[in-house]
Amino acid sequence: MRTTIPVRLAERSYDVLVGPGVRAALPEVVRRLGARRAVVVSARPADWVPGTGVETLLLQARDGEPTKRLSTVEELCGEFARFGLTRSDVVVSCGGGTTTDVVGLAAALYHRGVAVVHLPTSLLAQVDASVGGKTAVNLPAGKNLVGAYWQPSAVLCDTDYLTTLPRREVLNGLGEIARCHFIGAPDLRGRSRPEQIAASVTLKAGIVAQDERDTGPRHLLNYGHTLGHALEIATGFALRHGEAVAIGTVFAGRLAGALGRLDQSGVDEHLAVVRHYGLPAALPADVDPAVLVRQMYRDKKAITGLAFVLAGPRGAELVSDVPAPVVTDVLDRMPRDSLENLVGTTEAAAP
């Protein structure tokens, strides 16, 4: 079954296709764009990308946080220029979320913007990273600190790609699906994988349509991410993004409870949802809460103090100026486990 989800924006609206075999739509997408040349940047085997129908340069990429740096973007833009890519042509990404991030930023910067089409191959990229137009790379000081908003011309979420994923990579994507439970999605537990993807994308498309530039409602998509990003950095990215967001989601429930925004049943629901998906729910034993708090002060939402997206009587919303002692106390009360056991939890969980 194929689902088409429109992302309706004031400018640069596009469709997200979800289902088996949707990558075959790529030549038609390229034709509609009027491109004469294409650069395909792929972290997957060459035969994972169908022909574009135009003269094409294939560049090999590698997924992973170490590639999310400005030097990678510079290298890609240099290859675009050597190939003679024009502003009327197209760039195609094929890979996980780090690949769509880096390629999207390169497309945003080259000639001040060239069309980009994403073929996300991981569950994480299909449910979140490839949709919405956020592109970014990391700096030593923090995650996603340099970026741009550049909407794709199409996103083709071919669910056939997911059959090749290692179990841990599936769980990585489920971390984003789990957090959707608390920001307006229906209960996705027990749904088929294509249904989970389509529901997650539909939720995100609606939020992005209201707030493309992340000045209001789009903050909701950061549920669990404030601590999640800090955990990724503190563990040297030994925790995958979805794993860290899952722990951040449990923490968000506990923090909301500590602030009187949720009763105990609401706090417990966060843990139940995360555990249902087989995701980690404890802090790594060797991570210092003080380090996490310092890192969370660097979060883009922390304008005047610590800020978190938290559940409450009116639903999830951005809560600013959260007292650091309260945050530290909640972190201190979180269960702890070794990083090896936390990663082992996701390895052993059923997809």
Swiss-Prot record:
Is Amino-acid biosynthesis there in the keyword field?
Answer: yes
Which key words tag this protein in UniProt? Answer: Amino-acid biosynthesis, Aromatic amino acid biosynthesis, Cobalt, Lyase, Metal-binding, NAD, Zinc
Q: What does this protein do?
A: May catalyze the conversion of 3,4-dideoxy-4-amino-D-arabino-heptulosonate 7-phosphate (aDAHP) to 5-deoxy-5-amino-3-dehydroquinate (aDHQ). Probably involved in the formation of 3-amino-5-hydroxybenzoic acid (AHBA), the precursor of rifamycin and related ansamycins.
- What is the organism of origin for this protein? Amycolatopsis mediterranei (strain S699) (Nocardia mediterranei)
- Name listed for the protein in its UniProt record: Putative aminodehydroquinate synthase
Task: Give the matching CDD domains.
Answer: DHQS
Protein residues bound to Zn(2+): 176, 225, 241
Please describe what happens when the gene is knocked out.
Answer: Inactivation of the gene does not affect rifamycin production significantly.
Q: Which InterPro entries match?
A: Dehydroquinate_synthase, DHQS/DOIS_N, DHQS_C
EC id: 4.2.3.-
Q: Does the keyword Amino-acid biosynthesis apply?
A: yes
Record gene name: rifG
- Residues annotated for NAD(+) binding in this entry: 65-68, 97-101, 121-122, 134, 143, 161-164
